[in-house]
UniProtKB/Swiss-Prot annotation:
Transfers the 4'-phosphopantetheine moiety from coenzyme A to a Ser of acyl-carrier-protein. SUPFAM superfamilies: 4'-phosphopantetheinyl transferase. Keywords: Cytoplasm, Fatty acid biosynthesis, Fatty acid metabolism, Lipid biosynthesis, Lipid metabolism, Magnesium, Metal-binding, Transferase. Belongs to the P-Pant transferase superfamily. AcpS family. This is Holo-[acyl-carrier-protein] synthase. GO terms for cellular component: cytoplasm. It comes from the Bacteria. GO terms for molecular function: holo-[acyl-carrier-protein] synthase activity; magnesium ion binding. Its EC number is 2.7.8.7. It comes from Chlamydia abortus (strain DSM 27085 / S26/3). InterPro entries: 4-PPantetheinyl_Trfase_dom, 4-PPantetheinyl_Trfase_dom_sf, ACPS, Ppantetheine-prot_Trfase_dom.
Length: 122
């Protein structure tokens, strides 16, 4: 496998907290899949994990070279913690159209920021 592209993103957790407070479930349903919501909302403070996934989706979209839009939407990028590290799930059509075989992702957060780095492989 070879690296096709990389993508990074950083976001203030307070932005996600404010968006959830203002738009509540509508915002969650627009950005996050049901599985992502179930995982994050079980936490005492879900905002850091939601922000990390938001940054992850942005980083993945950048690594795919598409951004969020016509080819890849917010919920097309699903970030789940299957083992100890997050895994990226995309619709098969995205892999085929872009010639990508896999996307690796690292996400992290501190008290104020969430960050992510994605590597798209061909």
């Amino acid at each position: 496998m070879q690296i096709a592209h990389i993508g990074t993103d950083i976001i203030e957790i307070s932005r996600i907290r404010k968006a959830i407070k203002t738009h509540n479930q509508r915002m969650l349903n627009k950005i996050f899949t049901k599985k992502e919501q179930v995982y994050c909302l079980r936490l005492i403070d879900p905002c850091p994990s939601l922000a990390a996934r938001f940054a992850g989706k942005e980083a993945v979209a950048k690594a795919l070279g598409t951004g969020i839009g016509k080819i890849v939407g917010w919920k097309d990028i699903e970030i789940l913690k299957i083992s100890k590290q997050p895994e990226v799930f995309l619709p098969e059509r995205v892999y085929q159209k872009l010639g990508i075989s896999k996307v690796l992702l690292s996400i992290s957060h501190s008290r104020e920021y969430a960050t992510a780095m994605a590597i798209a492989l061909i």
